[in-house]
Amino acid sequence: MAPPAPGPTSGGSGEVDELFDVKNAFYIGSYQQCINEAQRVKLSSPETDVERDVFLYRAYLAQRKFGVVLDEIKPSSAPELQAVRMFADYLAHESRRDSIVAELDREMSRSVDVTNTTFLLMAASIYLHDQNPDAALRALHQGDSLECTAMTVQILLKLDRLDLARKELKRMQDLDEDATLTQLATAWVSLATGGEKLQDAYYIFQEMADKCSPTLLLLNGQAACHMAQGRWEAAEGLLQEALDKDSGYPETLVNLIVLSQHLGKPPEVTNRYLSQLKDAHRSHPFIKEYQAKENDFDRLVLQYAPSA
């Protein structure tokens, strides 16, 4: 079984983290709960106010409410909030993305304030969306926070560098083994490892869902564990639950496309999920790869078509 969920004194210092519930909700993908907690919590210092607002606006970004972030974060706002606004600007304005990345490149080439963890995370997020994982990793390696390391683990797993991901996970475990982010990273690495580790990953996702909330992130994590073990029907139930919560969540739709193929569902079922994904997330990497393969297939068909 997974270790017990961490409490608000996690981090080794014994001090109470006033933002524990806000952060925890964000990390497990419970974005509305994060917003609610952020608006309700009473804080003891201006620095904590800024940190609270960072998570509040990042939760709005996760809900694709870019306008809220762009309207409310002003030029006079703290540098951490300016970084969140930069990412909101990137996500909201496709036509401006190249210029935003170019400006970010210039900032990264100068002396960066490595204590501004939010800037490093937002820079890495932009580079990742821009299909530049190397630049994302360079940004993250300048920070030493648990969240920077957790994001590094995610990127390394996407690059099939399980060996390096394990090393980063070890760093997280040495820093704070019981932290929510460390537990999630442990589940991601276990899922990528496969075999008997799949059950360990499943227990972590399940325990978090039971103790906190069965979020889209956790439901998809559980479903991925089932799919990796060939338990397609069990995965389908979890993915349907996720679909009921949000019919446009990209990971749910990608997993349902894969699952439909394995269960031999009619082609129209797979195509329906594919259309939903295209409508909601036309620049999603899965869609780009799918369209590239479609184009390759069309070229092959023309190549071997009988001449008139």
Curated annotation (Swiss-Prot):
<keyword id="KW-0963">Cytoplasm</keyword>
<feature type="modified residue" description="Phosphoserine">
    <location>
        <position position="45"/>
    </location>
</feature>
<keyword id="KW-0931">ER-Golgi transport</keyword>
<feature type="modified residue" description="Phosphoserine">
    <location>
        <position position="99"/>
    </location>
</feature>
<keyword id="KW-0333">Golgi apparatus</keyword>
<dbReference type="GO" id="GO:0006891">
    <property type="term" value="P:intra-Golgi vesicle-mediated transport"/>
</dbReference>
<keyword id="KW-0597">Phosphoprotein</keyword>
<keyword id="KW-0472">Membrane</keyword>
<feature type="modified residue" description="Phosphoserine">
    <location>
        <position position="13"/>
    </location>
</feature>
<protein>
    <recommendedName>
        <fullName>Coatomer subunit epsilon</fullName>
    </recommendedName>
</protein>
<dbReference type="GO" id="GO:0000139">
    <property type="term" value="C:Golgi membrane"/>
</dbReference>
<keyword id="KW-0813">Transport</keyword>
<comment type="similarity">
    <text>Belongs to the COPE family.</text>
</comment>
<comment type="function">
    <text>The coatomer is a cytosolic protein complex that binds to dilysine motifs and reversibly associates with Golgi non-clathrin-coated vesicles, which further mediate biosynthetic protein transport from the ER, via the Golgi up to the trans Golgi network. The coatomer complex is required for budding from Golgi membranes, and is essential for the retrograde Golgi-to-ER transport of dilysine-tagged proteins.</text>
</comment>
<dbReference type="Pfam" id="PF04733">
    <property type="entry name" value="Coatomer_E"/>
</dbReference>
<dbReference type="InterPro" id="IPR011990">
    <property type="entry name" value="TPR-like_helical_dom_sf"/>
</dbReference>
<dbReference type="GO" id="GO:0030126">
    <property type="term" value="C:COPI vesicle coat"/>
</dbReference>
<keyword id="KW-0832">Ubl conjugation</keyword>
<keyword id="KW-0968">Cytoplasmic vesicle</keyword>
<dbReference type="GO" id="GO:0015031">
    <property type="term" value="P:protein transport"/>
</dbReference>
<comment type="subunit">
    <text>Oligomeric complex that consists of at least the alpha, beta, beta', gamma, delta, epsilon and zeta subunits.</text>
</comment>
<dbReference type="InterPro" id="IPR006822">
    <property type="entry name" value="Coatomer_esu"/>
</dbReference>
<dbReference type="GO" id="GO:0005198">
    <property type="term" value="F:structural molecule activity"/>
</dbReference>
<dbReference type="GO" id="GO:0006890">
    <property type="term" value="P:retrograde vesicle-mediated transport, Golgi to endoplasmic reticulum"/>
</dbReference>
<keyword id="KW-0653">Protein transport</keyword>
<dbReference type="GO" id="GO:0006888">
    <property type="term" value="P:endoplasmic reticulum to Golgi vesicle-mediated transport"/>
</dbReference>
